[in-house]
Structure formats: structure tokens, C-alpha cells
Regions:
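Extended amphipathic alpha-helical segments enriched in small hydrophobics
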Residues: 58-140, 151-152, 156-160
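FAD-binding core of flavoproteins
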Residues: 1-92, 98, 217-241
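Alpha-helix capping/hinge segments and adjacent helical runs
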Residues: 147-241
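Secondary-structure capping and boundary motifs in well-ordered enzyme cores
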Residues: 12, 33, 37, 85, ...
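Structured core elements
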Residues: 2, 17-19, 124, 196, ...
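Short, well-ordered loop/turn and helix-capping segments at boundaries between secondary-structure elements
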Residues: 21, 25-26, 46-51, 130, ...
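Short glycine/serine/threonine-biased micro-segments
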Residues: 9, 35, 102, 137, ...
């Protein structure tokens, strides 16, 4: 079993590809039921999402005294290292106003308008996400809020990248200690495209909104069936497994 890191254009490697060559797994190592891989995968993802909540709890406890808290902080830092760029992929709206005041861009009426529009969009996306969390906590069925919030976050990130570029000019592309925010602005520019892909692409979110909210018909699909029924080619002979 070979694991290879996938280099990203922002210089990080948060994901990998796994190659299994002549790998054999014992029946004793079967997780769940045979043919129930999808259920196992969804359960794993659900627990992974909950782990981010626990990670936030650790962050809230940061700085507390005691060996237990110190061990938790160290464990969290190691686990979180590949994802240190995640705040940048959201656009870092929190840096916009400060940079505009430092560079004098705040005096430009057009840029002030873009900054105001960005903050309005960011707050709207935040409140939409809060509604989705509140509905889930109340045990209500999943509504359109999740997809709407995800799509809004993508729009916010793209606009934030454009506003950062307008404020910093050519310096937005610089990295290193003498660059704007020590290279954070440049990392924002090459990280924001990820928000439109991770957690379901913008196109997937639009499909969900179209089908579940607007009641539009689903797109035709040739793969609409169990994976076990997908036709395969084995040793030159087409079989159905």
C-alpha cells in the first residue's frame, strides 16, 4: 500500500492518493457488512465532521494550564498542520478593512462599495449557516440552508480574493516576510478556488437547490444505480458482477 501526497498550488498537501498493489485483506478485517462500504464511508465522514467540532473545543481551551490541556493542544496542532491554510481559502474577510486603511484604499469610493458589499455577503452567508445548524440541532429534516450557505461561502471567497487584489495591487502576489501580511494575501489568492470544490462543488450545490427547492427535474444520469451493477471489463471480457 503506497500513499502519495498531492501537492496543491498553494504549496500545501492536505490530501493524498493511495495505491494498493496486490494487497490482500483478511476476512477478519472486514468492517461492517460485505457490500456495505457506502454506509461505512458515510459513517466515517459523519464522525470526521464531528471531529472538527471537537477541534474547535480544543482551540477554545488553548492556553489553559495542566498536562491534559497541553497534550490536547499538541495533538491538535499535529493533526491540524496540513490544514493551516483553511482560513485563507475562505477569503479572510477579517483582514480586508485593516488592509484598506493601511494602504489608503478606503478613500476610494468604488473600493469602499466593494468592501461593504463583501461584508454584507459574508454576514448573510454566516446567518444562513447558523440557520442550518439550528435546524439540525432541533432535529428538523435537512433543508436548502446548507447548500445555500455553501454556495454563498464560495461567492464570498471569490469576491474577497478580488478585493484583496484591488487593495494590495501587484504586491498581493508577493510571498515572504516583507510581503502583505507576510504572504497571507498571496496564499488567499491561490487557496480560495478550493472553497468552490471542497464539500461539494458549486455545481452540485446548484443542482441540489434546483431539485429540492425549486422542484426542477433531475438531470439524466447513466450511472443511476448500485455500484455493484456497473458493467466492468475483466481480462478483455465484459462481465456483470
Amino acid at each position: 500500500v503506497e500513499v502519495r501526497q498531492l501537492a496543491q498550488m498553494n504549496g500545501h498537501a492536505s490530501f493524498n492518493e493511495v495505491f494498493m498493489t496486490d494487497a490482500v485483506v483478511s476476512r477478519d478485517d472486514l468492517v461492517g457488512e460485505a457490500g456495505g462500504g457506502w454506509k461505512c464511508a458515510m459513517t466515517t465522514l459523519a464522525n470526521e465532521r464531528r471531529s472538527f467540532d471537537r477541534a474547535r473545543d480544543v482551540g477554545a481551551r488553548k492556553g489553559r494550564q495542566g498536562k491534559i490541556f497541553a497534550d490536547l493542544e499538541e495533538e491538535f496542532a499535529i493533526a491540524n498542520e496540513p490544514y493551516t491554510w483553511y482560513p485563507q481559502r475562505a477569503g479572510r474577510v477579517d483582514l480586508i478593512l485593516q488592509r484598506a486603511m493601511e494602504t489608503g484604499a478606503i478613500k476610494d469610493p468604488a473600493q469602499r462599495q466593494d468592501i461593504a458589499r463583501l461584508h454584507i455577503m459574508a454576514e448573510s452567508a454566516k446567518w444562513t449557516g447558523e440557520r442550518a445548524k439550528a435546524a439540525a440541532k432541533a432535529g428538523k429534516p435537512q433543508g436548502p440552508e446548507g447548500s445555500l450557505g455553501k454556495l454563498a461561502a464560495s461567492n464570498v471567497a471569490r469576491l474577497a480574493a478580488r478585493v484583496h487584489t484591488a487593495i494590495c495591487g501587484n504586491d498581493a502576489l508577493l510571498t515572504g516576510p516583507n510581503s502583505p501580511k507576510e504572504g497571507i494575501i498571496a496564499e488567499i489568492l491561490v487557496s480560495t478556488p478550493a472553497i468552490s470544490i471542497a464539500g461539494g462543488t458549486d455545481e452540485i450545490q446548484k443542482n441540489i437547490i434546483a431539485e429540492r427547492v425549486m422542484g426542477l427535474p433531475k438531470e439524466p444520469r447513466v450511472d443511476d444505480g448500485p455500484f455493484r451493477d456497473v458493467r466492468r471489463n475483466t481480462s478483455g471480457t465484459t462481465t456483470k458482477s
